[in-house]
Amino acid sequence: MKKSVNERVKEAMKEQGVDLLLITPSSDMVYLLGKCMMSDERLNVYVVPAEGRDFLFVNDVYGQEVAGWGIPETEVVTWKDGENAVSLLLEQLEKKRLPYGKIGIGASMPAGFLVPLQEAFARTRFVLHREILGWMRRYKNEQEQSLMEEACSRCTEALKAVMKAGSGWIGKTEGAFADALCREMEQRGISEAGALVCAGAQAAVPHYTGKDGIISADACLLVDFGGKYRGYCSDMSRTFYFYGGCGENDKRREFEAVYGIVLAALEAGQGAAVLGGRMEDVDNAARRVIAEAGYGKYFTHRTGHGIGIDTHEEPCAASGDKSVIEPGLAFSVEPGIYLPGKFGIRIEDQIFMTVNGAKVLHDYPRNEWLVCG
């Protein structure tokens, strides 16, 4: 019989000598429970012992909500405002006779919780649970693959809808484009929709977040966008060049040449995503293409990152990541060249590794970069 996620987590905890996991509201809680309450200044944790019954330790404000989740075999323990939550949590562990010599926590646990916990649990060793939950989350099952495929398909259709306006976007702001794209995603059932839209020279800043830049003729537009479908992410980038109606010119010729290099790097990176290879192979392959074309110093970030419940997860397509490429991994391949004061180009697709190899989840044409109509 196939083991549940909870059973596999507890097995991994025992193997690594971890007594407890303390899971604060985060994507880790979503992964384990399929639910998550709002994160605020109150200590709310899902307590997972290696041996024994799990329980939710939450402020009374969230007690009714959490009880309504109906999580089997999971007790809900509440505390009230004005009480010392850390002391009460320690009391619960003692009462339930749960060991806490080594506790695993997530990298996103706020310092405002961790420091008081370390002070109260003076003899406890706190460790990141990356080798338990992080490792498990990198391998997606068929259902997770299906949800990511649907997220990617819906986001792709949203971009196609927005780009129907073609050169009608000239003179509009980055913010107007981003708002329209997010509306299209939301209309297609995408939650947490977001878009970075970078016009002209702003595209040379890899994670530019402005909204006031103007989309111009004879200039580029870099669009990095995505969202979630039923909890799973799409992350995609495309770069366009808006035709100014003046025939070919030096700006367009330079853009086209650099675009071809980035596209070749993308294809090389995707080609290196083979079962049995290493994640760093993807980065090396893409980076080699750009370096050999003379633009190595303008490719300033890793080639890709894992994707799942979070937009950025493990593993990474980066130098030094020697993770073996195996079925179930999902990650981006997104090489870029950023020329300060001129333009930037990034092309990003999402990949899922099946038993037969890499499957690209976005189908927006990569060669449709010139916007004329």
Briefly describe each language-model feature range.
Residues 1-373:
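Active-site neighborhoods and metal-handling regions in enzymes and metal-associated proteins
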